[in-house]
A protein has these predicted regions:
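Secondary-structure boundary/capping positions in well-ordered alpha/beta enzyme cores
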Residues: 82, 105-106, 164, 175
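RNase H-like nuclease fold core
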Residues: 1-87, 92, 96, 101-104, ...
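Acidic/histidine-rich catalytic cores and adjacent linkers
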Residues: 136-253
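Amphipathic alpha-helical transducer elements in NTP-driven molecular machines
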Residues: 19, 37, 62-69, 88-95, ...
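Conserved beta-strand -> loop -> alpha-helix junction used to position metal-binding or nucleic-acid-contacting
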Residues: 85-92, 97-133
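A short, charged helix-loop
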Residues: 60, 118, 129-133, 137, ...
């Protein structure tokens, strides 16, 4: 417990994290005799050397009007400085909290979540073929070419999948933010896939638990698992190259 609390509350003032990823992990937890789906908010960062770190493991503050705002304020209280880029899905409460808490930071809408949002408006039998079409948008070498590909898709499918096209149009620009950071690995900063892979691994490990008896046990076990990954990452090769991080900090300065 002491190690878990120390990890979750450690100061962040001695490290700069230019890039953050934010996501939530849901598990079944027993609360007041009921079984509920409870979220833990996880924030990953890449430091100036390009190494990954886990900087927040926080249960969703359901009683708060802005649980993400509470999370970000806690990070700032621990010494986190405003990052250059934050990657997440487009949950409205999350996006507004990012804008309010970190003015000046760029926000990248996770392209994988965005594709799922778009495909939700496409008939099941046509999802696979349409997914292969829209995926090409974010593989374009430049933002201008990505926009052109997106507009071509909109023109071609406006009548066939009007709601999907509207979704694409509404969220397109936020999904192209990563092009403003050309020195960084586009595959890694255009989505939160890294967190999703980790979440799948954690779910595999928590499946033996089934239902957590309370929130404290949930937070404790999640943090313990994540601490193990943080240790591994600290001695593994950089996730983003140090040169690309330094170049990004210079450009954004």
């Amino acid at each position: 417990n002491e190690q878990v609390n120390e990890f979750r509350n450690r100061p962040l003032s001695n490290t700069v994290y230019p890039v953050l990823w934010v996501d939530a992990l849901y598990e079944k937890v027993r609360v007041d005799g009921r079984i509920v789906s409870m979220a833990i908010l996880i924030v990953f960062g890449v430091d100036e050397n390009g190494h990954r770190d886990i900087i927040a493991v926080e249960p969703m503050a359901e009683e708060s009007r802005s649980p993400y705002g509470v999370l970000f304020q806690d990070l700032k209280d621990r010494g986190l400085t405003t990052p250059k880029l934050i990657i997440s899905d487009a949950h409205s409460g999350l996006v507004s909290a990012i804008q309010e808490s970190f003015p000046g930071a760029s926000w990248q809408r996770c392209k994988v979540h965005f594709m799922r949002n778009i495909l939700a408006y496409v008939p099941q039998k046509e999802k696979k073929s349409f997914a292969s079409v829209i995926k090409e948008i974010w593989l374009a070498p430049t933002a201008d070419l990505a926009r052109k590909r997106a507009y071509d898709v909109m023109d071609a499918y406006a009548k066939r999948f009007p709601k999907a096209v509207q979704c694409l149009e509404n969220g397109l620009e936020d999904s192209l933010t990563f092009y403003a950071f050309p020195k960084l690995d586009a595959r890694k900063i255009s989505s939160s896939n890294m967190i999703e892979r980790l979440n799948r691994e954690i779910r595999r490990r928590t499946s033996v638990v089934g239902i957590f008896p309370n929130e404290a046990s949930y937070v404790r076990l999640m943090t313990t698992y994540l601490m193990e990954y943080a240790v591994d990452w600290s001695v593994s090769r950089a996730y983003l190259s140090q040169d690309s991080i330094e170049a990004t900090l210079l450009i954004a300065a």
